[in-house]
Amino acid sequence: MSDLVFYDVASTGANGFDPDAGYMDFCVKNAELLNLAAVRIFFLNAAKAKAALSRKPERKANPKFGEWQVEVINNHFPGNRNNPIGNNDLTIHRLSGYLARWVLDQYNENDDESQHELIRTTIINPIAESNGVGWDSGPEIYLSFFPGTEMFLETFKFYPLTIGIHRVKQGMMDPQYLKKALRQRYGTLTADKWMSQKVAAIAKSLKDVEQLKWGKGGLSDTAKTFLQKFGIRLP
């Protein structure tokens, strides 16, 4: 009869996960540790961190970005992909979204242009840069190229979604990668609600994205050389 006895198991997804609550918890725990230098190092090395974690079977890891060390759930190792992730657990993907929002908060909460310039010169988005998009396109658009920003569609004005839509339309991305964004809330609105109530806002966001100067031609030789140091080679 033992083969007919069943027990509940932990969910393998983040059902009930509230990104806003997760972000606030993250900020409270890391308020005294976060700085632009550490965030810069994270974004320039996130892809390398994922690759390194994919070779390590440990369920948890403690990568260090500059002087900032953080515990993450390692869901990149093939055998760990179905492990449960708690609401306040951190993954590289969640960290990417949280840190992008943290940078935007720092930018918007400070009216000092010298501070804006410091942020623009310190934080580099390799994904945006490789598409010819820079800070001059606006902080929300520039930061929305970071993975994880789809968790905050309202904060980033739908750009994480509409950047994805544009890339799919141009054959630059498989439609399946839109799934994460299409499951997210917009503020308090569930996906089925904002898909019907926010059509005009999404259309405006998409228009902004389509008007960007897409393409690798927007990069200077200096920028291309810099990105090569981090494994991004452009023609």
From Swiss-Prot:
Q: Which GO terms describe its biological process?
A: symbiont-mediated suppression of host gene expression
Tell me which GO cellular component terms the UniProt record holds: helical viral capsid; ribonucleoprotein complex; viral nucleocapsid
Molecular function in Gene Ontology: RNA binding
Q: Which InterPro entries match?
A: Bunya_nucleocap, Bunya_nucleocap_C, Bunya_nucleocap_N
Q: Where on this chain does RNA bind?
A: 18, 47, 50, 75-76, 81, 94, 124, 126, 129, 167, 177, 183-185
Main localisation: virion
Which cellular compartments is it found in? Virion
Q: Which domain of life is it from?
A: Viruses
The UniProt keyword set, sorted, is: Capsid protein, Eukaryotic host gene expression shutoff by virus, Eukaryotic host translation shutoff by virus, Helical capsid protein, Host gene expression shutoff by virus, Host-virus interaction, Ribonucleoprotein, RNA-binding, Viral nucleoprotein, Virion
Q: What's in the domain note?
A: The N-terminus and C-terminus are involved in homooligomerization and play an essential role in viral RNA synthesis.
* Family listed: Belongs to the orthobunyavirus nucleocapsid protein family.
Its name, as the record gives it, is: Nucleoprotein
Organism equals Bunyavirus La Crosse (isolate Human/United States/L78/1978)
What gene is this protein translated from?
Answer: N
